[in-house]
Amino acid sequence: MPSNGDLDRQIEQLMECKPLSEADVRTLCDQARAILVEEYNVQPVKCPVTVCGDIHGQFYDLIELFRIGGNAPDTNYLFMGDYVDRGYYSVETVSLLVALKVRYRDRLTILRGNHESRQITQVYGFYDECLRKYGNANVWKYFTDLFDYLPLTALIESQVFCLHGGLSPSLDTLDNIRSLDRIQEVPHEGPMCDLLWSDPDDRCGWGISPRGAGYTFGQDIAAQFNHNNGLSLISRAHQLVMEGFNWCQDKNVVTVFSAPNYCYRCGNMAAILEIGENMEQNFLQFDPAPRQVEPDTTRKTPDYFL
């Protein structure tokens, strides 16, 4: 197994946006799997920690996030999924986050988003990018196999519940979530799917999601869930919000989105949420990093409900 020195060299290489070799990715994913298999569906996290939303392959904006929030391991991070697809640098982005996880396992928590799936990545860019950068699909397979092991949710100091998407009509308690078998491809429906796909909504109760997966849930649902589970807040990602963060549902829910100028065209700010040693909350907003020369690519990304 590679030493910390090897990992440090790989992280240094990735910070320059240079992909690892296929063999290094395979070894890295093996190491990461051994760590993630020991983690929980509701992974406990201590404060202080900085909570981040979608990244979507926007590598230089991830570097900007670290510049604004502090580098690992000096800052503890919790990422709420969607590392790949849409941006130009999914390979480098997910490689860096996984390498940081392996190097600093207790300082970094990486959750699963709806894009950490075999099916979605074949449509929205990660699969094609792996083919283009490596000449075969092996790296795509190593990462998508690893994605099955990512925790679904995290719980900061038993108070702030973090996940990619939202709530599920099948899950009333955190113990319900703890009892799920997560080590599988994201299903098309059911509680695991809902956690990664659902969205808060202005209407009360449960609704049909326009995304075709998951549900919409109202303020009444979020307030009841928080009350039942002794929570102060649900922190989630999954939706573009123009200021980078957005409170909703009487401050029972906050959306954090960390990909500025999403898809290189949406004009939004990004944000991260710092949770301090006394659970105080501070949002840091940031604009896109200066544009790098984009790689030669004529990929057409299908438009899709944001």
Swiss-Prot record:
Transmembrane segments: none
Assigned keywords, A-Z: Abscisic acid signaling pathway, Cytoplasm, Hydrolase, Manganese, Metal-binding, Methylation, Nucleus, Peroxisome, Phosphoprotein, Protein phosphatase
GO molecular function, one term: metal ion binding
Known cofactor(s): Mn(2+)
Cofactor remark from the record: Binds 2 manganese ions per subunit.
Location within or outside the cell: Cytoplasm, Cytosol; Nucleus; Peroxisome
CDD domains: MPP_PP2A_PP4_PP6
Reaction(s) catalysed by this chain's protein: O-phospho-L-seryl-[protein] + H2O = L-seryl-[protein] + phosphate; O-phospho-L-threonyl-[protein] + H2O = L-threonyl-[protein] + phosphate
PANTHER family: SERINE/THREONINE-PROTEIN PHOSPHATASE PP2A-RELATED
Annotated function: Dephosphorylates and activates the actin-depolymerizing factor ADF1, which, in turn, regulates actin cytoskeleton remodeling and is involved in the blue light photoreceptor PHOT2-mediated chloroplast avoidance movements. Associates with the serine/threonine-protein phosphatase PP2A regulatory subunits A and B' to positively regulates beta-oxidation of fatty acids and protoauxins in peroxisomes by dephosphorylating peroxisomal beta-oxidation-related proteins. Acts as a negative regulator of abscisic acid (ABA) signaling. May regulate ABA-dependent gene expression.
Protein name as it appears in the record: Serine/threonine-protein phosphatase PP2A-2 catalytic subunit
Species name: Arabidopsis thaliana (Mouse-ear cress)
